[in-house]
Amino acid sequence: MFRGKKYQEAAKLVDKTKLYDPEEAIELALKTSYAKFDETVEVHVRLNVDPRHADQQVRGTVVLPNGTGKSVRVLVFAKGDKAKEAEEAGADYVGAEELVAKIQNEGWTDFDVCIATPDMMGLVGRLGKILGPKGLMPNPKSGTVTMDVAKAVKEAKAGRVEFRLDKTAIIHCPIGKVSFGKEKLLENYRTLIEAIIKARPAAAKGQFIKSITVATTMGPGIKINPLKPL
């Protein structure tokens, strides 16, 4: 794959044979950021599990102490008092049948997080084929099917991120923007890694974290020592 001159210059700063400690890696990620926009800093964690087995799934949510730096649009499926609570907590879209119809008929998914009260799931279940592939389907495990809609909305707005394995046993997760600086990114990084370690399934054997890479949107990957992930 051909990369531009700026990328190649940035890549020269990274020792591909070295496993960096987290602080060094984040510092280097900031140094290798060259885009004109405020790049996102992402972490990619490869785990020693087989995602084909139900007992080796890894997923969860964590509130990053410094947020993600992006504005989060929240949709809530709720009625009555719960709809009012969601609106007061700052949800961008609140409703029931009319929102389901909009999503079904128009394929509308102009939101980042979808929350539902348990009684709405019969209705929301119809949207599985549209919301599922985009990772937007409300789920009790990720705290997005709940009676406490106000808390869920506030957490989503504050920088709660959901992490889950992809088919190749890797978790991809943003930890903030380049403009956050090293300390805030490091704090978010450690919070995420601690949450992933806590979510280790009982069926996982041996060394749980196989590799960790940190990179900005346009920058090269920087490897962190998986034996000293924090």
From Swiss-Prot:
InterPro entries, per the entry: Ribosom_uL1_bac-type, Ribosomal_uL1, Ribosomal_uL1-like, Ribosomal_uL1/biogenesis, Ribosomal_uL1_3-a/b-sand, Ribosomal_uL1_CS
GO cellular component assignments: large ribosomal subunit
* Gene3D superfamilies noted in UniProt: 3.30.190.20, 3.40.50.790
Q: Which GO terms describe its molecular function?
A: rRNA binding; structural constituent of ribosome; tRNA binding
Keyword Secreted appears in the UniProt entry: no
Q: Which domain of life is it from?
A: Bacteria
The family database entries (Pfam families) matched by this protein are listed as: Ribosomal_L1
Keyword terms = Repressor, Ribonucleoprotein, Ribosomal protein, RNA-binding, rRNA-binding, Translation regulation, tRNA-binding
Q: Does the keyword Protein biosynthesis apply?
A: no
Give the GO terms filed under biological process for this record. regulation of translation; translation
Q: How does it assemble?
A: Part of the 50S ribosomal subunit.
Q: What does this protein do?
A: Binds directly to 23S rRNA. The L1 stalk is quite mobile in the ribosome, and is involved in E site tRNA release. Protein L1 is also a translational repressor protein, it controls the translation of the L11 operon by binding to its mRNA.
Q: Which family does it belong to?
A: Belongs to the universal ribosomal protein uL1 family.
Q: Which HAMAP family does the protein's record reference?
A: Ribosomal_uL1_B
The record's annotation in NCBIfam families points to: rplA_bact
Protein name, UniProt field: Large ribosomal subunit protein uL1
- The protein's organism comes out as Caldicellulosiruptor bescii (strain ATCC BAA-1888 / DSM 6725 / KCTC 15123 / Z-1320) (Anaerocellum thermophilum)
The gene it comes from is rplA
